[in-house]
Amino acid sequence: MKKRVLAVVMCALMAGSVFTGFKDAGDDKELVLFTWEGMFPQEVLDDFEKETGVKVVYSNFDTDETMLEKLSMAKGGDYDIVIADDYILETAIADGLAEKLDKDSLENIGNINSLYQGQFYDPDDEYTVPYGVGIPLIVYDPEQVDIDIKGYKDLWDPSLEDSIALTANYRVINGITQLSMGESMNEEDVDVIKKTGEKLLELAPNVRLIQDDNTQNALLNGEASVAFLYTSQVTAALAENPDLKVVYPEEGLGFGIMGMFIPSEAPDKDAAYSFMDYIMQPEVAAKCTDYIGYYSTNKAADELVNPDLVVPDDVTKGEIVQNVSQDADAQYQKNWTEFKAACD
C-alpha cells in the first residue's frame, strides 16, 4: 500500500519449544519475509531471532505486481510471509497462492480491529491478517476556519471558498463525494456516477489546489486552511503543527489495507505462523506501527502507539476503493477531468 491512499500492525509471544518444526540449514533457521522496503524496524526482526533462534531474511519488491509475478513463478513457494496491498491479495487468494490460515496457531488473532476485517479480498478472514491501514483524512486549521468540520459534506460550505487542498486521486475524490451523498465509493451505476460529477463540480469554487506530493505543505504554509491528506501527510502535518484538527468523517472512512499471508507452499509454515503471531503481540505491534506511520490495526496496541495513528472507537464505518467496470471507471475519469478544469 506504499503507493496509495492510504495503512499498520500486530503481535504475540511464543515459547521456544514451539519452534521444533523449523527447517535447518546447518544450525541456521530462517524465515523469508517478502514485502516492501522499510516495513519493519530492525529491532523487531532482531528480537524475533533472539527469542526464537529464527533469522528473518528480508526480501523486497517494488510493486504488488512484481510480488505476484515472483510468487506465481515460485508456485506459492520460496517465501514464508508476504505483506502486500488489499487488491493484490484478492488475486493471490484466487490463484491459490495463499494458505488457508490455521487460527488455532494464532493466539493473538483476537487483537485485530474488526473494522479492518471481512473485506472484499478475504470476506471470511480465512487467508489474511491486516498489517497496516492507510486512511486519507480531512485536516484543518481551527484558527483559520469558522465552521466545525465533521464530515465530507462540510467541504462544500461556502465559507471555505478557495481554501481547500486536495490530493490528486480521481477515485478517492469521487469516492468521498459519493460518501457525502450517501452512496458507495464503488458505485457502478453510470447515472449515479454522473450525479457524483455534478456534485463534485459544486466543490470547485472551494478548491485552492490539487496535488499528490506534499499536499500538507499548503496547510502548513497557510496557502490552504483545509486539506484532504494521505496518511503520511496527516502525520507529517501534525508533527509540524499539533494544533491542527483531524476529522474522522461522520459519513465513514475510505481506506486501503496492507495484509499479510502465508504462501500456499511456504518452505517453513511453522516459522511463518510464529512470526505472524509474534507481530500481533501488542508491544511489538506498537513498535511496528510507530515505525511505518500507518494506522494501527491492532486494537490491543492502540494505547501504546502514537495517538495520531489510532482511529477513534466511535468510527465504525469504512470502505476500500475497489476496481469497477470499464464504463463506470470511464465516467469517474470524466468527472475528474471536468472537475480539475473547473478548479483551474
Model-derived regions: residue spans:
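Mature extracytoplasmic/periplasmic domains
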Residues: 254, 258, 263-320
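Extracellular/periplasmic bilobal clamshell ligand-binding domains
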Residues: 305-344
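A ligand-binding cleft/hinge motif common to bilobed small-molecule-binding domains
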Residues: 89-91, 226-243
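Short, low-complexity disordered leader/linker segments with a strong preference
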Residues: 1-31, 343-344
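General small-molecule cofactor/ligand-binding pocket signal
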Residues: 57-59, 208-210, 245-247
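Periplasmic-binding protein-like
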Residues: 194-202, 240-264
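Extracytoplasmic ligand-binding site segments that recognize negatively charged/polar headgroups
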Residues: 41, 78-79, 83-206, 210-220
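Early extracytoplasmic/lumenal segment of secretory-pathway proteins
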Residues: 24-91, 217
